Design a protein with these regions (language model features):
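Cysteine-rich micro-motifs
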Residues: 20-29
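Short Cys/His-rich zinc-binding micro-motifs
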Residues: 2-19
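Conserved hydrophobic/aromatic beta-strand scaffold that supports enzyme active sites
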Residues: 5, 95, 114-116
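Short beta-strand edge/turn micro-motifs at domain boundaries
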Residues: 112-132
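Generic structural detector for well-ordered beta-strands
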Residues: 7, 82, 116-118
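Surface-exposed, charged secondary-structure patches
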Residues: 73-110
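Core segments of small alpha/beta cavity-forming domains
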Residues: 29-74
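A short beta-strand motif that forms part of the nucleic acid-binding face
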Residues: 29, 100, 130-132
Length: 132
């Protein structure tokens, strides 16, 4: 069991809003269980960036847009994820607007994106996104 708080920052639904552990949040997705919705997949992908899990990032990228290789920014320190909106756009499509904060070489930056997702055979995939 991994009692570490999940990097995605999701909290429990109870009034105290306690941080969920990796095992209770993104861990099942990383272990191969399908994400229940696009927001959960987005959160699990963020956690994969934090953990440096390139195989997971690539496996959850839709085959129509997936790069052959992916190199993560060396020395990046991920600082947090904010989900601004999760919108269902069709029976098997959704969008997630998020802000991911990180620091590289002492410089803080943020990625504000509207990402598109598609569900195929019961699994959600990241397709692409627009930087906002």
């Amino acid at each position: 069991m991994n009692p570490t708080p999940c990097p995605c920052g999701r909290t429990s639904a109870n009034p105290q809003g306690q941080a969920l552990t990796f095992d209770a949040c993104c861990g099942p997705c990383h272990a191969g269980i399908a994400a229940p919705d696009a927001e959960s997949l987005m959160r699990s992908r963020y956690s994969a960036f934090v953990c440096g899990d390139i195989p997971y990032i690539l496996a959850t990228w839709h085959s129509s847009q997936r790069p052959v290789n992916l190199a993560l920014e060396a020395g990046a320190k991920w600082l947090g994820l904010s989900i601004k909106q999760h919108r269902i756009t069709g029976q098997d499509t959704a969008e997630v607007e998020f802000i991911a904060r990180f620091r590289v070489g002492g410089k803080a930056t943020r990625q504000h994106e509207l990402s598109r997702f598609v569900r195929e055979d019961g699994r959600w995939f990241y397709v692409d996104g627009d930087v906002l």
